[in-house]
């Protein structure tokens, strides 16, 4: 019945799961079945090697891998008919009596400074096969939007919020960057956010600060469902965001992006299309200008056509790139 993977976490974490799902598909030669919050199902539809777990493959898999130790995942694992149930945790202290009763194997692997995507990749399976590559998603189809939402001309998408208020950056800094983008020729600017009260307030403050600099933006906060947001982000000329799901999605969809980090450390990886800076960085405007120039010359967008069968059977990022 194939392999079942269970993860009940936020949207960004589900995106970061893509490389290890790709690896499992390569190792087993079959599509992986993922049990996650149902609202993230559109993300799964953009992973050709994975499908949302339903039917017998949900309840009677050949093997089960739980990639988080939360109660929802543990309950789902307990009611799955499968002898081989493996739990991955970052440290032994996370293991409880319930975990020992439910799982046949518990692997405690310290992240060691690795991000979630790389930690999962290194902790699951063997070192043979494809090498690690960051998350990759297919381009959302055209029917994932509605009339009047996605501009026809090149536009900037600003997503300045996430689930944590501590990651929010100064509206004045966003306004200054949007002024730079406007001067570069990107006159159409959209700002998006969720439906929390502070999301609306924060986006409104950014719009006000931007207006003072002579730039008008369109606020679509709380006005998109997930498929529409994915479509909108994938068609943007440039994405500006905080560290969170939007940043991971921009990377996975290969949309040029600038991510500001208000808390935590800035990733050391250097990628000319996906730049990370500490909030308040004095060179942000210069970096944005360079990002615009580089991304305009390196045209490496995902294919919009159907993927070959070889990519759907043990897909790897390198194979996907070669098929473009």
Q: What is each stretch, according to the model?
A:
Residues 1-324:
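Catalytic machinery of carbohydrate-active enzymes
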